[in-house]
A protein has these predicted regions:
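Positively charged n-region of N-terminal signal peptides that target proteins for export
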Residues: 1-4
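Gly/Gly-Pro-rich "capping" loops immediately C-terminal to redox-active cysteine motifs
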Residues: 38, 46-82
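Extracytoplasmic/secreted proteins, especially bacterial periplasmic and envelope-associated proteins
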Residues: 32-36, 72, 76, 105-109
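Axial heme c-ligation environment in periplasmic c-type cytochrome domains
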Residues: 58-67, 82-109
Length: 117
């Protein structure tokens, strides 16, 4: 018990805090992400997922709803889009980041939009 208290006191003294959340996402970033998500040239997420406001969605992937509940950690969502094979080697989802289908900036915008759903 003594060591636990010492450890807690040391962590508090060093200023350990929770990870920062990307709360500074602009409306323009979300709109750019939506454009990429719905566009057929880059993201084309509608080909496989049901998304609010989307027309003619596919159904081979899960619907993109309640994303903050499904991915409380935004980085986990980003990792999933970057390369879904890391969590499921048999996935049919393309590795958008690993295969450079999306640039790093485009990936951030897509994550901004999807995380807003």
């Amino acid at each position: 018990m003594r060591y636990l208290m010492i450890t807690i006191m040391m962590l508090l003294a060093w200023g350990v805090s929770a990870p920062k959340v990307n709360a500074e996402v602009s409306r323009a970033d979300i709109e750019r992400g939506k454009s990429l998500t719905f566009g057929r040239k880059k993201g084309n997420c509608l080909a496989c997922h049901v998304i609010a406001d989307g027309t003619l969605p596919g159904n081979s992937g899960p619907p993109l709803v309640a994303m903050k509940a499904r991915f409380p950690d935004r980085e986990k969502l980003k990792e999933q889009i970057y390369d879904a094979r890391k969590r499921n080697v048999n996935t049919i989802m393309p590795p958008f980041g690993a295969h450079e289908i999306l640039t790093a900036e485009e990936l951030e915008r897509v994550v901004d939009y999807i995380y807003s759903l």
